[in-house]
């Protein structure tokens, strides 16, 4: 499982994303989380988390996309607790 999370993050780091692009999470209990500054997503700071309320996701503006959709968009929305 760690390897899958690592690969997901590695994909983010080595990929050049635009707001229209997306990446996949590989575990059914994972969602994707981005930390955003302003309106610009930072794919290198995105990672797959086991739950959208994971502490890592609590900073800045984020978007979560469940595994059931198969994709995690780089669009940013404000975090609402």
Curated annotation (Swiss-Prot):
Signal peptide region: 1-15
Q: Classify the source by domain of life.
A: Eukaryota
Which Cys-Cys disulphide bridges does the record give? Answer: 25-48, 32-76, 33-57, 36-72
Site note Interaction with carboxypeptidase applies to: 80
Gene3D superfamilies noted in UniProt? Carboxypeptidase inhibitor
Which keywords, in A-to-Z order, does the entry hold?
Disulfide bond, Metalloenzyme inhibitor, Metalloprotease inhibitor, Protease inhibitor, Signal
Q: Annotated Gene Ontology MF terms?
A: peptidase inhibitor activity
Family, similarity comment: Belongs to the protease inhibitor I46 family.
Its function?
Tightly binding, competitive inhibitor of different types of pancreatic-like carboxypeptidases. Inhibits human CPA4.
- Designated name of the protein: Metallocarboxypeptidase inhibitor
């Amino acid at each position: 499982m760690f390897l899958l999370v690592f690969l997901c993050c590695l994909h983010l780091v080595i990929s050049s994303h635009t707001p229209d692009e997306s990446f996949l999470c590989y575990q059914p209990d994972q969602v994707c989380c981005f930390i955003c500054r302003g309106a610009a997503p930072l794919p290198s700071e995105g990672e797959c988390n086991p739950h959208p309320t994971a502490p890592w996701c609590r900073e800045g503006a984020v978007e979560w996309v469940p595994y059931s959709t198969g994709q995690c968009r780089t669009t940013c929305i404000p975090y609402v607790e």
